[in-house]
Amino acid sequence: MSARAAAAKSTAMEETAIWEQHTVTLHRAPGFGFGIAISGGRDNPHFQSGETSIVISDVLKGGPAEGQLQENDRVAMVNGVSMDNVEHAFAVQQLRKSGKNAKITIRRKKKVQIPVSRPDPEPVSDNEEDSYDEEIHDPRSGRSGVVNRRSEKIWPRDRSASRERSLSPRSDRRSVASSQPAKPTKVTLVKSRKNEEYGLRLASHIFVKEISQDSLAARDGNIQEGDVVLKINGTVTENMSLTDAKTLIERSKGKLKMVVQRDERATLLNVPDLSDSIHSANASERDDISEIQSLASDHSGRSHDRPPRRSRSRSPDQRSEPSDHSRHSPQQPSNGSLRSRDEERISKPGAVSTPVKHADDHTPKTVEEVTVERNEKQTPSLPEPKPVYAQVGQPDVDLPVSPSDGVLPNSTHEDGILRPSMKLVKFRKGDSVGLRLAGGNDVGIFVAGVLEDSPAAKEGLEEGDQILRVNNVDFTNIIREEAVLFLLDLPKGEEVTILAQKKKDVYRRIVESDVGDSFYIRTHFEYEKESPYGLSFNKGEVFRVVDTLYNGKLGSWLAIRIGKNHKEVERGIIPNKNRAEQLASVQYTLPKTAGGDRADFWRFRGLRSSKRNLRKSREDLSAQPVQTKFPAYERVVLREAGFLRPVTIFGPIADVAREKLAREEPDIYQIAKSEPRDAGTDQRSSGIIRLHTIKQIIDQDKHALLDVTPNAVDRLNYAQWYPIVVFLNPDSKQGVKTMRMRLCPESRKSARKLYERSHKLRKNNHHLFTTTINLNSMNDGWYGALKEAIQQQQNQLVWVSEGKADGATSDDLDLHDDRLSYLSAPGSEYSMYSTDSRHTSDYEDTDTEGGAYTDQELDETLNDEVGTPPESAITRSSEPVREDSSGMHHENQTYPPYSPQAQPQPIHRIDSPGFKPASQQKAEASSPVPYLSPETNPASSTSAVNHNVNLTNVRLEEPTPAPSTSYSPQADSLRTPSTEAAHIMLRDQEPSLSSHVDPTKVYRKDPYPEEMMRQNHVLKQPAVSHPGHRPDKEPNLTYEPQLPYVEKQASRDLEQPTYRYESSSYTDQFSRNYEHRLRYEDRVPMYEEQWSYYDDKQPYPSRPPFDNQHSQDLDSRQHPEESSERGYFPRFEEPAPLSYDSRPRYEQAPRASALRHEEQPAPGYDTHGRLRPEAQPHPSAGPKPAESKQYFEQYSRSYEQVPPQGFTSRAGHFEPLHGAAAVPPLIPSSQHKPEALPSNTKPLPPPPTQTEEEEDPAMKPQSVLTRVKMFENKRSASLETKKDVNDTGSFKPPEVASKPSGAPIIGPKPTSQNQFSEHDKTLYRIPEPQKPQLKPPEDIVRSNHYDPEEDEEYYRKQLSYFDRRSFENKPPAHIAASHLSEPAKPAHSQNQSNFSSYSSKGKPPEADGVDRSFGEKRYEPIQATPPPPPLPSQYAQPSQPVTSASLHIHSKGAHGEGNSVSLDFQNSLVSKPDPPPSQNKPATFRPPNREDTAQAAFYPQKSFPDKAPVNGTEQTQKTVTPAYNRFTPKPYTSSARPFERKFESPKFNHNLLPSETAHKPDLSSKTPTSPKTLVKSHSLAQPPEFDSGVETFSIHAEKPKYQINNISTVPKAIPVSPSAVEEDEDEDGHTVVATARGIFNSNGGVLSSIETGVSIIIPQGAIPEGVEQEIYFKVCRDNSILPPLDKEKGETLLSPLVMCGPHGLKFLKPVELRLPHCDPKTWQNKCLPGDPNYLVGANCVSVLIDHF
């Protein structure tokens, strides 16, 4: 400016620059470092001049260099080392090495006026000047990547310049200047003393920098470029800022009077831009920053504009303060900032003269330049820090590290501000502004098009105009998306004032170069790409965003992934900020919802590490969310750390490493002492590490060694301390032991735990690691590598937050001393620093860490029960969460919707979700009924409630986990773990539920009627249009509502919440992929919306709308069915849905399946398959395959859903897989076994009685069952595969096998109505057959031996047929027909009406609802009574006939004795006909369906395969031999477990299978009267215990009651009681964690234990044709050889001991044994190391075996 001013003042004088050399000694200051930022270098030449000098790009105010160094000073030497022609990094390194003092020799350009005669000898001066200026500017932009930027050269510079000073004009002038003969002279004045004066008086003049063609000025001809403006409208302009001059011009109101003086030599035009210098000064926000920025600029070719911007802060503290400066300082003057500071600048125009000038000074300069630029950024309103920070030319708006210092460095471009080309346009906004925008924060916002006849066009805006400001909002550094949104958000009719500047040439270059936005972001959530062009990413990845309006549409950003060494790796699409926030919020919020327990775990895996106790960990994690404070996308800039970064070491020998470093290198490293924390500190963590403590160490120029948790690391990053996090990766457990023995023999820490925790830490928090060192136990080479790594990291540029830590300071995590409060805050994660004990201990100090390790151990212990050990919060979270969580959340939530069929992973993820929440599993166990309960309004609700209570006492933890997994077959497995307790509890509770909870109320209680509806919707959606519906809408609805359930799985069991719980589980998954879900919703909105809406209504009789699709069914068992659909019942009923999909039999099958499921659940529960998240993942994946996907998505959304139909869906027939009997039982329905099937079939009828069923306890149980199924499916894709045939047999691994007749299925807990209730719930789940859809996504579909979609379609057709034809008339028969044959069809038809649409959506919800109703009613008349109102009304008629049959399933076997699940409808009816009948009358039909479902679930597992599973299209397989019924369970082999789980009733295990067999045939044989017959048949078929277990309900007499009670009974019967399974569990001294059994035929199937995640996938053809082979397996834990399990963390068995049987069985084709392995690799390795048939997948270890 001085040059300009001088030139302006005297044309006779020529401005020349001379170079003065000064040597200064800088003393490093704690907060500032040396207080300078440098740019340039051989590798980062000035983008315009090409100068390679090292330039001071910024001088921090108040820093050591203030007053000594100035911006644009060329660094000649540092400590005697020449800086000529060196690389930027070298210069930075020299400064870093200088220690506390640095002797810097600089050359400073001094501009002097010389007579015109005196030629300016130094051509360089121009170049240098330019480069100087440019450099300065560059630094701003350049720090970010001066080299590239510079190479982008004039253009980028222009870009930034244009923002800072009008780009083209300046560059033009520059170019002109260069062309001019007189070149600037370099002048350097070096002060010998600080207070010495230069003796110069500078002035500035406004001159005409550019005249636009065809403009008034051009036409007038009296004004020429280079003219000095003396007056504007009578006001003298000397020393006037550009901003003021611009203002004067703006006020001219159409008439502008100016007095100009011609400068023939155009000296001013030839003067190199000083703006850049100033800019540069600004750019040099910090000395360190400049380096980083320049690197950043290199990093992003365009970020040169902002390079210096972020060279802020030596210490985070300083950084925050300077960051402001730097931000502004970034080269491109952040116009927004500029504006705000512009004003300041304007006040100090002279500041320009001294390069050292403050940021404000820079601002003034900017002001001049700002004419153009300033115009852009002039509006202080845009001081918006972030956009403002992004310099005009700065590619990375957020890149500038320093947030505010160079506020308006951009202003430096003030020269452009007053350009003649500028125009101020005012108009009223019409429907739109009428503008199309181009460009972005890197180049400015340009008008790409103007709508003809729009106000903007009329006012003269045209293409190529740069929008500098809109309504006082600076547009110079704003990203295009923000600009568009800002214009869109302007109210119609509001006056719009746009300051624009004509820059057609720049615009042309922008368009040609396709540049616009350029800024860097760091991701803080995990995302799975939604399209082939998308980019998936994990936390902590960095991207350069180059287009925020990809394809001209809002929603997606075009970004480039930044790989190692800051190189741009790949380009693709990522969600925009808004969507990212939603996705991230879902991921982080999920855990908070009910069922969030588990979710929290997953979500807070890293955070958890800070918590000691498993339980405490879980609670604490929920209570104090560890989720990062960072936004989904954190704007970052690459800069150098101006301070010694704290060092955090993770790994098994971290404690040793810290002590060794501090001991051997005390001058470099110091351990940060922890201070006692207020009450409640972790045992091991003596306290917290205060930020103040860290700061003190940093101020001593030492690395603070921190023993903190990953959570604390995240907080430190947020506070911008950017710790160096080194992970010492152990080579093996033994290696850890060896090293610790050698390094710290006195340590008592467990090498095993340290090793495991390290694995978990790596899995969950790898994104926090800055470097990883692989340990070699043979030597101590790690120590040298550690020191080297720390030094290397310290010298590297760091991606730092562009702005101040918004929450950091406010969060107590002040960048200053306050930060200590952040760290110290007892509640803060920082507090966990010390707590690190937990975190660290997770990996390092296992033994001493009583708390943490205890946690771990506790977790492991809990793991057995809960399946989600908190372990170290980090570990546990990471294990399940990482894979599961991300997969789960992501896939479940997002993925399933994405690829309903290709979502095996999602299923896994779902698995994970199901698996991951231990609480969910628990809830599931508890909600075996609860799930049903969600689906079974009355029973479900009631059951859920009681169940909750009981389960809570018994084994809520396990049950909770189950629910999450329960949604699919996995859920079944999941349930299995808690089956015993859950079953038992459920039995007790269910009766209670039905007695003390009105089904309706319960359903209501579901608390989320909408949610329930959603869940139902989800299930139903799947049935109706599972592909899109459930993935999207329902999942969302379901997930969120269920999430809460997850948290209170028991609760959910207790209340409809169970249902919700599922939802929550899904929500967890969903949250992760919330967006995806949304997407899905978009995909399925129509149907899902429909369903969703219906579902919303669905909670109650509202189902009728659903009736269209599933209306009747749903209504009948609105929730119950929903439960079944969503839950497991849908599975059974879902089989019908599948049937609708491909065959009606699914309806039957579902019923049967449900029954079977109930029976099997006991074993399943026993198995705890559900409980085992890992196991779940497989089923999850498995189920997902085809239908599964859709269903799964829905189910994913709602676990309940997933298990219900999702899995069933996938299996198609295999729906039974989860409720093994679900589908197969359908077939047996006709025969004795079909009777069981009828149960399944009946689940379809339940839709008619949905209202009742919703209330039905049975329904609730069904819900659980369904959930289990879902989970199982999720968990084991293979399970699903076999599901078709195997599902039937699968449900009760041991029990089923033992009780071929189906009695075992029912039998497990036929003794009590509670059990029945559970059964009902299971039955309720039967509707889950929707799951088959889930299955398809995985593999299960193939195993299922029928295409779920095919099935679905067939089922749909049949359902519609059935719905219309006998939905109302013969629900029982319908079930039977659907499940078994003709009867099933009627039932099916009934269901179908609801189911037809619903079935495609996963009829299960409806079925579930019905089942639930059944369960509840059957379970308890009382419940039945509550449900009746909703259910009966819709299903009263239809359900009447079937009710008897359905209830029969419930027979005492199911209820009382796990074994004698007694699908005896008669018994069932008899048992609880009275209460239910009244309610069930309408729902009676449905209840029978439910009962059928129960039977089907129970026996159906056997019959279902035959009927529905095997021949997905067969509707009238009611005459399935009992054997077949039994066989049906095969597909449900896995299902069986879910059943068990669902019912958590040991009793169910034993009788479930036999009863099922017996009942199924009967049921299947009967159509309208089939229920009764079935009941009788079941009675007969059922073994005595089955009978005893069955509470018979007269099918005809007590249809309503029968339905409700029946359902309750069936569900109880279906689930193999956990106790039964567990009884088996403790065999031979082994602890049987889970048991699964099922009967499979040549169609194959999947036998899975949701709880454990173990599954056997039996391919088609593995079993000879015509052979129905019962297969079982037990998952044992031999504590003597297996490490403790952290079930809470989702850690199943690290090395599961799986006992398969029967021994000696040989397969024609190898069967796949899948062992879940979420986190533990030791597990994988232990399984079958070296075996070619052994495959370690993401979530499981797969072993191929050809014999047992």
Curated annotation (Swiss-Prot):
Residues 23-110, 186-264, 421-502 form the PDZ domain. It is a peripheral membrane protein. Residues 516-584 form the SH3 domain. The modification Phosphoserine is found at residues 125, 175, 178-179, 212, 241, 275, 277, 280, 284, 290, 294, 297, 300, 323, 329, 334, 337, 353, 617, 622, 810, 821, 824, 828, 837, 912, 968, 1071, 1111, 1139, 1366, 1413, 1545, 1617. Residues 149-175, 299-327, 357-377, 879-892, 998-1014, 1110-1125, 1269-1286, 1336-1347, 1403-1420, 1538-1547 have a biased composition (Basic and acidic residues). Residues 123-136 have a biased composition (Acidic residues). Phosphorylated at tyrosine redidues in response to epidermal growth factor (EGF). This response is dependent on an intact actin microfilament system. Dephosphorylated by PTPRJ. Residues 893-906, 1389-1400 have a biased composition (Low complexity). Residues 329-338, 934-953, 963-979, 1061-1072, 1459-1470, 1512-1522 have a biased composition (Polar residues). Residues 102-112 have a biased composition (Basic residues). Gene3D superfamilies: 2.30.42.10, 2.60.220.30, P-loop containing nucleotide triphosphate hydrolases, SH3 Domains. The modification Phosphothreonine is found at residues 185, 267, 354, 809, 846, 848, 854, 861, 868. Residues 1151-1371 are annotated as: Actin-binding region (ABR). The modification Phosphotyrosine is found at residues 132, 822, 1140, 1165, 1354. Disulfide bonds: none annotated. SMART domains: GuKc (SM00072), PDZ (SM00228), ZU5 (SM00218). Changing residue 209 to A: Abolishes interaction with GJA1. CDD domains: PDZ1_ZO1-like, PDZ2_ZO1-like_ds, PDZ3_ZO1-like_domain, SH3_ZO-1. TJP1, TJP2, and TJP3 are closely related scaffolding proteins that link tight junction (TJ) transmembrane proteins such as claudins, junctional adhesion molecules, and occludin to the actin cytoskeleton. Forms a multistranded TJP1/ZO1 condensate which elongates to form a tight junction belt, the belt is anchored at the apical cell membrane via interaction with PATJ. The tight junction acts to limit movement of substances through the paracellular space and as a boundary between the compositionally distinct apical and basolateral plasma membrane domains of epithelial and endothelial cells. Belongs to the MAGUK family. Homodimer. Forms heterodimers TJP3. Forms a heterodimer (via PDZ2 domain) with TJP2/ZO2 (via PDZ2 domain). Interacts with OCLN, CALM, claudins, CGN/cingulin, CXADR, GJA12, GJD3 and UBN1. Interacts (via ZU5 domain) with CDC42BPB and MYZAP. Interacts (via PDZ domain) with GJA1. Interacts (via PDZ domains) with ANKRD2. Interacts with POPDC1 (via the C-terminus cytoplasmic tail). Interacts with HSPA4 and KIRREL1. Interacts with DLL1. Interacts with USP53 (via the C-terminal region). Interacts (via ABR region) with F-actin. The 244-aa domain between residues 633 and 876 is the primary occludin (OCLN)-binding site and is required for stable association with the tight junction. The C-terminal region (residues 1151-1372) is an actin-binding region (ABR) that interacts directly with F-actin and plays an important role in the localization of TJP1 at junctions. The ABR is also required for the localization to puncta at the free edge of cells before initiation of cell-cell contact. The ABR is also necessary for TJP1 recruitment to podosomes. This is Tight junction protein 1.
